[in-house]
Structures are given as structure tokens and as C-alpha cells.
A protein has these predicted regions:
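RNase H-like, Mg2+-dependent phosphodiesterase core
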Residues: 1-204
């Protein structure tokens, strides 16, 4: 099967105007446990790497390889860890939006592309549906976010082995839900999420 690549990189229009583009994406909006990770990347104008694409379509090995390459090649990047407490306080959408806004304000750039997330910022921007498939910068952000979050969940798996975090990454798989029903929730579960809220009285 032919590898998918960001052939029609959304950045080109802005690179042709000599504008530096920041791409932002996140990993971990749907899980019941663990943090949300948001990452932004700014590349040199005209940057090319056909291997960089939506993190969900890449193998774990490939994502790990690209994780280091992206950080080496990027003009700048930022990775933010949004805790379970922040998610419960603001809700997942607002927590994601806040983190993306902070990255957009932190990194020097002329234009911002997010993966389907509008931001109230003083920079030109576009909220691009399936941005990680259309923009190399957003795709790079998705890879940094995904690898970072997967590593965190593997660490938590060592602390809470019965939940299968190394494999399910906190998503509501059968094993994970059954473990919640049997052992209760942990300190890293998102208490505002339905299946977790129901079992709050039982803490691992």
C-alpha cells in the first residue's frame, strides 16, 4: 500500500508569502484516564519530510523515529501536558483550547493551523478539519503529542497494572472498564467522564 503523505501541504500558501507557520494538535481527548497532551511545531519555510503524516496512521516504531527527527528539524516546538485535574475543571474541549492558545502565544510564528480547534488569538489562524492529514506542521504536532502521551501511559501501567494502560492508553476498552468496575478508579482517572464518575466512590 502506498504511504500516505501530506502532498498538498496546507502551509505552502503561507510559506510562499514568507510566513512562518505553527501547527498544533493534541492526543488523548477520548480516554477515561491520563492527561491530554498538546504539541505545536514550527518548521523552516519549505520544509519537507514525506514520512510525517497523521500520527494515528503510523506505526508506534515510526512515530518514535519521527519524534526525535521532528524535534531536531523544527525551528521551535512546545509540548504541554494537561492534567486530569485541569480536564475535570475546564472540560476536555476548553482544556484543549486553553493549551493550544498558550502554545500559539508562546511560539514565534506568522500563522497558526490547528486541528479543528478555533482559538481567540492575535495571530492569523485557521481551524482545519483533519489538519493532521493536510498540514505537515499539524501532523508533526500530532506525532509529538501522541508519542509523549503513550510514554506517560506506559509509565502509569507500571503503577496501575490491572487497567492495561500500556495497551489501551486509557481508552474505555473492555479490560479497562471491567477493571474500573472491579478495583475502582485511580488518581489519574478523569472524574468528569461518565463511566468514571459512576465509580468515584471506589478509589484504587
Amino acid at each position: 500500500m502506498k504511504n500516505k503523505i501530506c502532498e498538498n501541504t496546507y502551509e505552502h500558501e503561507y510559506w510562499n508569502l514568507n510566513k512562518y507557520v505553527l501547527g498544533i494538535d493534541e492526543a488523548g481527548r477520548g480516554p477515561l484516564a491520563g492527561p491530554l497532551v498538546v504539541a505545536g511545531v514550527v518548521f523552516e519555510i519549505g520544509y519537507k519530510n514525506p514520512a510525517i503524516y497523521d500520527s494515528k496512521s503510523l506505526s508506534e516504531k515510526k512515530r518514535e523515529e519521527l519524534f526525535d527527527i521532528i524535534q531536531e528539524d523544527a525551528l521551535d516546538f512546545e509540548i504541554k501536558i494537561v492534567t486530569e485535574e485541569e480536564i475535570d475543571k475546564y472540560n476536555i474541549y476548553r482544556a484543549d483550547q486553553r493549551a493550544m492558545t498558550e502554545i500559539a502565544n508562546d511560539l514565534a510564528c506568522d500563522f497558526v493551523i490547528t486541528d479543528a480547534m478555533p482559538l481567540a488569538i492575535d495571530k492569523e489562524m485557521v481551524s482545519l478539519v483533519k489538519g493532521d492529514q493536510k498540514s505537515i506542521s499539524v501532523a508533526a504536532g500530532s506525532i509529538l503529542a501522541k508519542v509523549t502521551r503513550d510514554r506517560i501511559m506506559k509509565y502509569y501501567d507500571e503503577i496501575y497494572p490491572v487497567y492495561g494502560f500500556a495497551k489501551n492508553k486509557g481508552y474505555p476498552t473492555k479490560q479497562h472498564v471491567e477493571a474500573i468496575e472491579t478495583y475502582g478508579i485511580t488518581a489519574i482517572h478523569r472524574k468528569s467522564f461518565g463511566p468514571v464518575a459512576f465509580h468515584q466512590e471506589k478509589l484504587f
